[in-house]
A protein has these predicted regions:
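Conserved N-terminal entry element of GNAT/NAT acetyltransferase domains
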Residues: 1-11, 139
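Acetyl-CoA-dependent GNAT
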Residues: 7-67, 73
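Short coil/turn motifs at secondary-structure junctions
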Residues: 60-62, 80, 113, 139
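Non-catalytic, surface-exposed connector residues within folded enzymatic/regulatory domains
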Residues: 65-69, 84, 128
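Conserved acetyl-CoA-binding loop-helix of GNAT-fold acetyltransferases
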Residues: 74-77, 83-96, 123
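Conserved active-site alpha-helix within GNAT-family acetyltransferase domains
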Residues: 88, 112-132, 136
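Conserved GNAT acetyl-CoA-binding A-motif
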Residues: 91, 98-110
């Protein structure tokens, strides 16, 4: 079983929506995902035409430092495919895109409770930037 990373295509949106719901508990809206495909890089790994792993890269610009960077979100792998190199394969593709697009750094946020993910990020040479996230919600 080969592990191939590809960009999410319109024909795979329904599978991706099911994946997001299963992994993150969010019911993504098809029209929003279609917009995100045009705006961001959504990389997926499929098995039997089903999305089983994914990462989203949002290109941002740090105007004070005059640097482009990727903000990483929605990195996930279905439970039965974990610890088999899927997330590492996604990150290998991310590293290729970093070089191709003159990206200066990667950034992501991760909840304190996600210790397994933290080990993975540290293994990928991410450094912890001591920050707190503040959120204000509006109805």
């Amino acid at each position: 079983m080969s592990i191939e990373v590809e960009t999410l295509k319109k024909k795979d949106i329904d599978s991706y929506i099911n994946f997001i719901d299963e992994i993150f508990g969010y019911k993504a809206i098809k029209e929003v995902v279609e917009k995100q495909i045009r705006k961001n890089k959504i990389l997926v790994i499929k098995q039997n035409e089903e999305v089983v792993a994914s990462i989203t890269l949002e290109e941002r610009f740090e105007y004070i430092k005059n640097q482009k960077y990727y903000y990483i979100s929605y990195l996930g792998v279905k439970k039965e495919y974990r610890r088999k190199g899927y997330a590492s394969k996604l990150f290998k593709k991310v590293e290729e895109l970093v070089k191709e697009n003159d990206i200066k750094y990667l950034e992501l946020t991760s909840g304190n409770q996600r210790r397994t993910a933290h080990y993975f990020y540290k293994d990928k040479q991410f450094k912890i930037k001591d920050t707190m996230v503040f959120v204000k919600f509006y109805n």
